[in-house]
């Protein structure tokens, strides 16, 4: 394709709010253009990359007998009400109303819709298992879209849904998908690591995320250097081994602590280590207030709270709610309280006595507070995030951290949707049973960004061969010169029989062409310049920067060999 005919609006400067390298490079190289916050158009080069990614995805889905369909993005509220997610999903669900007053959602996911499609069709165990997938735009009303395609309000996904008669069948498909995802990410050029994860709003009993390692990743991966253990930090268990720091029990004392609001400020004020301070936070669980205690150097993990209480309806109490409840602001909270409120404490709070806590009065704290004498803990549990260097739950060693971008996730849903939506089949005994389900997602547009995050240098993108928008970049330095133009035209015709070629025939300066070529990042560059009359051209590899002069008689052989050896 001639570059003069392709819309590639490269930029010299990018908006300052473009933080991620992938966002900056996708804008700068003319692959995407922002419409509004979190919404982008995919321009010709990006569209070609997306087509290459989806071709690989389709191949791997068909390899495991997953069948492609296409469902509507617009979903009626009644389906979401059946599953209970219309009210539970939260503000991220994009809702709208038609002219007749009917409620709809622009789908962030399609569990309800696909269940409604199959529930009156998959009637017998003989029709199972069945796996369906689609590739489609999804929608999520992100509060703060950021990092370009990594956290947008409209995005492209591959989502698959499987239906089974028994758990063994689900296990097999889950494993098939897990392996297919591993192959997909390897083929598209991403270093992705599967990690144990939380199922979030989708639900289910078992799930893995596939994380593309990246410094700008919004998720923290906890992993072992001694085993294959890897988990999202939200899911990583903290091993509790008692390590008591007890001292002689002292009388309870109330002290003035002016302008002290954080655990670290309190530790500094008292001249004590922050891990000897106990923080108190108030949450609402299904509308009921509870207190949660952790030590000063630990942070409460609300995902673990949701898992512990078995509900997604958990939120941190607002400042106004806290003041109305206890008469003090959040920085002054403590468990010594004359109100009926359940108190939950992280396991590691048990290692301390003579606690330092808030007095439920602004400007004051209590010291020498002791469980059993001054207050009672209803239950202890693992309610916090793991720290780097702590022991891992598999016993393999200690926790190490890395950042990652979630590019895919696989879920065992069980009967969460089939039971609520009455999707049943007859088993081999003729009894009605709820369909057992799995769901499996890949962020296609996220994958595009993740590829760029992991495959770039100071000059631009470096596309892996499997997804590159074009195989070769043919550049005529000066098309006004007959010998250069004629040789470039001839090479373009020849190479087009075997490769996808982007032919830079523009009337631009050589520096502009070379800068754009580096920015766009095609794997191999062929430059027709001042030695065209001798039949000599330059061949350059984008990844290594290695270049050599080659006579046109040998050019096809050289290019073919280099291309075959590309990653």
UniProtKB/Swiss-Prot annotation:
GO cellular component: cytosol
A GO BP entry: prolyl-tRNA aminoacylation
Catalysed transformations (reactions): tRNA(Pro) + L-proline + ATP = L-prolyl-tRNA(Pro) + AMP + diphosphate
Keyword Cytoplasm in record: yes
Location(s), subcellular: Cytoplasm
Main location: cytoplasm
One Pfam short name: tRNA-synt_2b
EC number, UniProt record: 6.1.1.15
Entry keyword Nucleotide-binding: yes
Keywords in alphabetical order: Aminoacyl-tRNA synthetase, ATP-binding, Cytoplasm, Ligase, Nucleotide-binding, Protein biosynthesis
UniProt GO molecular function: aminoacyl-tRNA deacylase activity; ATP binding; catalytic activity, acting on a protein; proline-tRNA ligase activity; transferase activity
Protein task: Catalyzes the attachment of proline to tRNA(Pro) in a two-step reaction: proline is first activated by ATP to form Pro-AMP and then transferred to the acceptor end of tRNA(Pro). As ProRS can inadvertently accommodate and process non-cognate amino acids such as alanine and cysteine, to avoid such errors it has two additional distinct editing activities against alanine. One activity is designated as 'pretransfer' editing and involves the tRNA(Pro)-independent hydrolysis of activated Ala-AMP.
Free-text comment on this protein's domains from its UniProt entry: Consists of three domains: the N-terminal catalytic domain, the editing domain and the C-terminal anticodon-binding domain.
Family statement drawn from the similarity comment of this UniProt entry: Belongs to the class-II aminoacyl-tRNA synthetase family. ProS type 1 subfamily.
Quaternary assembly: Homodimer.
Protein name: Proline--tRNA ligase
Organism in which the protein naturally occurs: Staphylococcus aureus (strain MSSA476)
Gene this chain is encoded by: proS
